[in-house]
């Protein structure tokens, strides 16, 4: 089932980040009374009534130190283009101003469901200007307090009703591939090579692909769907907003894919933008292949290949399980090898480990390397089993998960990974206290 995107929109200082934190139940956004303080972490996985969705705090998109109405229009437009449902936050304690009305006007022009969240409501305040909020013209109004939790459950019930409306379980055995990376690394060229058609305009101008598209194709009697998230049109008015906009598109593609191809340019050094995109893959625990494109432009290939691999491993330590492949998308060199690697990864994902064999491996691991003392005691694992999930997931029952040091978790992960052939895919370990 596709993971939907819910965007929180509103002018600065109305409580978008507080609502974001309340919904995800963590403090991932910086919250301050100074307008425009939200930075960096603008998305998270969230869940309500067992339904998962991606939550975006559009306050994080505002990168300009000076907050103008046109900047608000830009972030609102981004939310409209990316989101399945929009939560429009206004301030109950202050009268509506021109920025609120600008946002409302833009949202009315969209075809997206909009829920008006009237924040900072405390049930004690006289509702003298409620009519103002009704005059914004939205049928779904909820009086909430993100600080005190008032009305949040009802708000989320409405969100879920919208994102569940068009759910259709399609039986499709196609492997969904997300192709992500910075603009101009050759994503569209790779799509063209994979599907053997010139379906997209490919040029040296950064950001010539306007929209993410899904393309179906077959290879060796196997079906694939490739999602190309190539660079967006670079409008001067967007400025630094472009990079974060592309992250949101990549996030959606990653969340709804089976396997991710992270493309980097062989002719350029790895940058923070590359590693930040890699971080999105790590957060979603998706299988990934790092595709080094434009290898045809490199001289002394044999000498350079080891250097490039070392550089990639150094920058993407958190993706240590990722396969690396060197290609030329334009020349179609080694392009079909990517599909062979994808098939290998899918085989690894389907491996089911017998419980008794898993416990033998873990018992041996604890004998070879006992857990270090942490938080006043040592971790003791009693037994473990694999549970149903897309990536191999194991529940380990122990004396107390608080005694687990991150380095020991990594050790156990590696023991399982190499014992059962999971060296090219992510795995998930869940530690639970034995009752």
UniProtKB/Swiss-Prot annotation:
Q: Which SMART domains match?
A: AAA
Example GO molecular function = GTP binding
Alphabetized, the UniProt keywords read:
GTP-binding, Nucleotide-binding, Repeat, Ribosome biogenesis
Do the record's keywords include GTP-binding? yes
KH-like domain: residues covered:
351-435
Where is GTP 2 annotated to bind? Answer: 181-188, 228-232, 293-296
> One GO BP annotation here?
ribosome biogenesis
Q: Which residues bind GTP 1?
A: 10-17, 57-61, 119-122
Cited PROSITE patterns: G_ENGA
Q: Which domain of life is it from?
A: Bacteria
Q: Which HAMAP family match?
A: GTPase_Der
The record's listing under PANTHER family reads: GTPASE DER
According to the record's subunit comment, the protein's assembly and interactions are: Associates with the 50S ribosomal subunit.
Give the similarity note: Belongs to the TRAFAC class TrmE-Era-EngA-EngB-Septin-like GTPase superfamily. EngA (Der) GTPase family.
What is the protein's known function?
GTPase that plays an essential role in the late steps of ribosome biogenesis.
- UniProt-recorded name of the protein: GTPase Der
Source taxonomy: Bacteria, Bacillati, Mycoplasmatota, Mollicutes, Mycoplasmataceae
Instruction: Quote the gene name from the UniProt entry.
Output: der
